[in-house]
Amino acid sequence: TPIIIDDVVSVGFASGRLSGIDLLSGRERWSVPIFRPQGSNEIARLVDIDSDPYVLGDSIFIAGFQSKITALSISSQTINWESQISTIRSLGSVDQVLLVTADDGQIFGIDTGSGKTLWTESGLQNRGVSGPLGIPDLNQLVVGDYKGNLVILDVNTGEMIGRDKLPGGAVLKIYSLSESGHFLVLSENGALSAWAIQ
């Protein structure tokens, strides 16, 4: 999904490039190769910017299938750091912690400035875990899985601190309503439910 930053639309392409398009003229202002194909066959060489670009301060974070997470400076269009985590899910953050659900279901807390992994939670591996939603006011994050579980984790440690069950099957997406723990959950059966962390 394209994202607007000031007067530029930033969009990722299947080629693995991230471009900045002038909002008024439609001309490309800049283009940066984020992911490069590798491997000996067409499947192994698949790269794509799959998650929505995520903006935090002067950085834009991009993630892709069979690739990595890249932090790019918006002002200079230079790469700040890369982390070898593959994901197609949306990213989140709380303060200076980037929140990532890897393709295998592991959840990572990554320092937004350095790219250093602060913690890893492996207890939800292979459970079809959703992208994380950060809840800044509570210093927590929430994810869902294919069985309809909502799981709350501590942003500082990655420790699981709460769990609840949805009646509607697998969690597809979690949408923020506020920074204080109110959110919507879309389930695979089409149900949309409102939640609040107490």
Describe the predicted segments one by one.
Residues 1-6, 31-55, 78-95, 118-136, ...:
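Extracytoplasmic beta-rich repeat domains
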Residues 6, 13-14, 57, 64-65, ...:
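Structural signature of WD-repeat beta-propellers
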Residues 19, 70, 108-109, 151, ...:
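WD40 beta-propeller blade core
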Residues 23-26, 73-76, 111-114, 154-158, ...:
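Short loop/turn segments that connect beta-strands within beta-propeller blades
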Residues 100-112, 116-152:
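Loop/turn-rich, solvent-exposed surfaces of beta-rich toroidal or solenoidal domains
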Residues 166-198:
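Blade-level signature of beta-propeller repeat domains, shared across WD40, Kelch, NHL, RCC1
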